[in-house]
Amino acid sequence: MQGVYGKIRALTARGDTAGALALADEWLQKQDDAGLYYLRGNALVKAGRRTEAMNAYLHASRLDPDSPAVEALALWRGIMDFYCKDMYNP
């Protein structure tokens, strides 16, 4: 699985968010994995799709309460609460 994680990270880092999301979605059809949802969230953030990213982080945090997605979700909730109160309802 680490090889897939690395590929998704590399695609996201070079700006190929469509490729990263396609690869993450392909693997998520095979198994529900917190790491994949976290990386999917990262790709969605880079693509500017923040609401979808928060949903991916939320799913990852439900699968694994120790996932880095927990911190990412808290960060985005804080940002949304501060800047976008009218666009986000907890």
Predicted segments with their positions:
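Structural marker of alpha-solenoid helical repeat scaffolds
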Residues: Q29-K30, R62-L63
